[in-house]
Curated annotation (Swiss-Prot):
Post-translational modification, as annotated: Activated by phosphorylation.
Keyword Isomerase: yes
Stored PROSITE patterns: PGM_PMM
InterPro entries, sorted: A-D-PHexomutase_a/b/a-I (IPR005844), A-D-PHexomutase_a/b/a-I/II/III (IPR016055), A-D-PHexomutase_a/b/a-II (IPR005845), A-D-PHexomutase_a/b/a-III (IPR005846), A-D-PHexomutase_C (IPR005843), A-D-PHexomutase_C_sf (IPR036900), A-D-PHexomutase_CS (IPR016066), Alpha-D-phosphohexomutase_SF (IPR005841)
Family stated for the protein in its record: Belongs to the phosphohexose mutase family.
Protein name: Phosphoglucosamine mutase
SUPFAM superfamilies to which the protein is assigned, alphabetical: Phosphoglucomutase, C-terminal domain (SSF55957), Phosphoglucomutase, first 3 domains (SSF53738)
Organism: Synechocystis sp. (strain ATCC 27184 / PCC 6803 / Kazusa)
Amino acid sequence: MVASPIHSRGLDLPLPSTMGEFGLSLPRSPLFGTDGIRGKAGELLTAPLALSLGFWAGQVLREQTDTAGPVIIGQDSRLSSDMLANAMAAGLNSAGVEVWQLGLCPTPCVAYLTRKTAAIGGIMISASHNPPEDNGIKFFDHQGLKLPKSLATAIEAGLRGQNQTSGLNASQWGRSYGQPHRVQYYQDFLLGSLPQPLNFQGLKVVLDLAWGASVNLAPHIFRSLGAEVIALHDLADGSQINVDCGSTHLHRLQRAVRETGADLGFAFDGDADRVMAVDAQGRPVDGDYILFLWGKTLQESNHLPDNLIVGTVMANLAFERAWEKLGGKLIRTAVGDQNVQAQMWETGAMLGGEQSGHIICHHHSYSGDGLQAALHLATLVQKSGLSLSELLSESFQPYPQILRNVRVLDRERRLHWQECAPLQQAIATAEKSMGTTGRILVRASGTEPLIRVMVEAACAETAAHWSDQLTSTVQCHLGDS
């Protein structure tokens, strides 16, 4: 190996002459999925991979912006997040890029600060709602938007080629700086996005923080506005992040709201880019409801151009029909907040989101923000003088919708499920039977080794019947034994 020496405390340490000498073992399939790179920490996501990714991300982002700004890195509480964040920073430094490390913070904080500063990009170390053993690397461009596919492809091409060096000497390497104080600017932004004057006094709120990125900010902001806050899972404990709690496991939040007599509750995922709510009776309030209520408020104040909302193929049919009755229009796109964002830019929509709780409001930001959505929903409750239950009674009754997951580890089978003839036949039979009274959606998850089967129907028994049939077919012909 041709190496350059690093002199440190009298030692000559070998420095690889190219990033290809770190011994990476990359999968044949593309690294980048629907939301950056995600996988098991220590298996797919290793320190050498993060180091090399940092180097190539630095090259691509600097070339794209043609400036010498920093890259901002934030992270959630996972045990592997420190390792990956520091390795990414080292790789970026080796490409001559300065790094600002925020430490623990929500994903939308990284997106906001990237857009509002001279940063050339942002990186969040998080696997969102995934279990503790997973981790992920999310990238943002200089506008605070999820990285365009072209830039992700360029980074991966460099990573797989591994045939270049930075051409920099030690005096040109970047430096890393701890910048946790900058999270305060994001907090100021959130408070500034709310109507003034505002006081949450008299409002009792339960917050499920999922042991994740929102443990510091969310309780502090709600309390600063005068709310009485009961916080669940409120330590940055990466060994428990998302375990039986957070936005995908609402039962603890529901119980706490009922037992404490709270007005409402909010559950965030591990990186707080999504939120789910519950009313005083503990009934779930998903992204469809949040979009409807926030959209109605914007519509009434003439701040919703063309009464347009962007949702996804998962949006409940009852939500769409209720919104149409108010003179609105729902445009559906593929699942994923990046797809919602793209459709919002294309159509000029100011509000969009997903049933899973990613909510984007272009009046304030360009990324899904669970904390912002929670604050605006709480504001609506406080200013209306109505309970969340009363507001929901004026919205819609969702059609029964059953979502089931089938584990399919084989990536090729998972991505090419459409080629399974028995499954296609089963889908056709179900669609013919339900006609216009229901919908079916089968898709491969972009973040987990799962095929998701969603069946929606006006009748709960019908939805359950076809959900059983289709899930069994997927398991039989594609699933793991």
